[in-house]
Each structure stands twice: as C-alpha cells, then as structure tokens.
Amino acid sequence: MKRRDFIRLSATLGAGAAVPVSLLTGCSSPPLPGSGEVRVSPTVCDICFWKCAGFVHAEDGKPWKVTGNPHDPHSDGRLCTRGTGGIGAYEDPDRLRQPLLRVDEGDGQTFRPVSWDEALEFIAGRMKEIADQHGSDRVAMLAHGSGAGHFKRLLHAYGSHIEAHPSYAQCRGPRQLGFALTYGEDVGSPDRTDMEHSRCIVLIGSHIGENLHNGQVQSLTAALDRGATLITVDPRFSVAAGKSSHWLPIRPGTDIALLLAWMNVVINENLYDRDYVARYTTGFEELRDHVQPFNPEWAWLETGLDPALIRETARLMAASAPATLVHPGRHVTWYGDDTQRERAIA
C-alpha cells in the first residue's frame, strides 16, 4: 500500500470513529425473537420473475425474518438481498395499508383513506357507468407481473380484451421474439438455460452479478467453480468482466457486428456441428452466404475489438460445444435493433 493511500484510509477510519454512537443506532441488526410463539410459514417472493420460495418467520403474528427454501430449485435455499429485505418493505412506514381515493381539496387534489368496501363500490360503480355509456370495450389494462393474471380474468369477464404489457417491450420482448423467430418458441422466464453445467459462457449485454436474478448468480458461480470459461462483452469492466478469462470492451451499439463476425469464423473454419445443421435446420446456406462479408477485420472497424481476439473467442466457444451458452440476457431493449441482435444471439 502506498503512503498516500494509507493516509487516506486512516483519515476515513478516524472520521468513522468520531461519529456519535447515537447516530449509529438505526444501523443495528433487527432484534432476535423473544420468548413468544414463533411460526414459520411458506411463501414466495414476488419481487422478480424468479419467484423464489422461502419461509416467513413470525413471532406472535409479527414477521421478523425471511429465509430461503432449500427445496426450491430457483433459490436453492438462498435469497438475494431484495428477498431477505422483504421484511423492510413490510415494516416500511410509507407502505400502503388501505385504499386511497383521490378527492378535490381546495384548489388541488389529495388522497383520502377509505375502507375496502367503499373502494370496491366506487370502482364497480365507475366500471358499470363506463360500460352503460360507452361499452365495456372502452376499458383497457396496462399490466405487469404475476398479479396481471387476476386482473386479466376480471377484464375479460367485464367484456374487454384490450390489454397491453408495456414492460414487455421495455424488457425482454425483443428477446422473446428473436428466439421465437429462430427456434419456434421463446426462452421463457425463468430462462431455460443450463448455465451450471456449461463449459463456456458468453455474456453479451448480461450483467449477471449486478442486475440479474438470484438463481442465475448461483448457477454462474457453480459453473465457474467447475472450471467453465467466461467471456464477457461489455464496454465497461463489470463485475462479470472481472471474473472472465476474456473481456471484450466493445464499442456501444455494435453487438450485432461482433455476432456476425463470430458466425463468420465458426462457419468458414468449419467449427460447427455439420450433422446437426443438416438434420435440424433450414436456411443455413443463406446464413453462410450472408455472413461472408463480415469477417473479424470488418468487425474491428465497427466494434474496436482486435480481430485476433474475435477469432480466439469464437474458437473457444466452438471448442466447448455443445456445452456453450451465449446468454440471452434480460432488459434487452437498447438501440432499436434489439430483435435482430437477439436473433443473432439465438
């Protein structure tokens, strides 16, 4: 450690020691349960699409911690910080605990707490009024998450089928469409990937370890423990890049150029499974002809990546086949060419 860094660190520690103890009381861990009755109930975390199973531990009816279910294949008994932090959301003083009705007050508007009966009567009355005056198909729904299914059934029973999922286009819609166009079906959610048993994993637009799901982080860790090769394509040196054997700091927005160059190398060097392609695919000749102009030297001008690095990583992927995974990613809506990028990944 350099002298300058040591002085800076010492100053930071000294400042921390000077903080009054009273200011740190809010940072203490939650108390352990007392002598009351503790009940453990199974639950499912609904914060993300992984829907990890767990248990809520409650003392005298008050939850005090959440733990993972060891029999759940999504979490393997371990929850992410959002899952274990669910108690914080439950105890949050700003959490809505009853319906609120928008009302006029003076020159503005505010929300007035109402009972569930009053809220449901108000909503039912407005829905009936709209149906009588304009028709039930004048009610639309913008939905997301697991709760959407319940409201969808209500909407259909009401007489409307006008529904949309804006998050589909903002998140994984291009991925689902790209894989459906290539394979005839989409990836699904959770993603149907066997990352744990892969010998080579390619992350291109997939920031696992920073913004993806608990189960995938565990699968990636298990794969690396088994000796898998990790290739990360990312303009920045991400957490995953720090774990990778190869980091490709690509120019933003040029992922398709790299994918085309990889295909060029794999096809022209006969690194693909020709028997599989002949038996199960259509249109391969058209793909082969299409990628001919897109060699690593061409991709270098687009992506800023060394042609030798492009060739090396393409050969690594081919050498590990069929246990090579190019991760499909999530939150894949970036530059307007996202469906085509996902088709290239597929």
List where the protein language model places each region.
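Short acidic (Asp/Glu) and glycine-rich catalytic loops that position anionic groups and cofactors
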Residues: 238-243, 289-295, 322-329
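Conserved alpha/beta enzyme-core scaffolds, especially Rossmann-like or related mixed alpha/beta domains
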Residues: 133, 277-281, 291, 326-329
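Acidic/polar loop patches that form or flank catalytic/metal-binding clefts of enzymes
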Residues: 64, 273-274, 310-311, 324-326
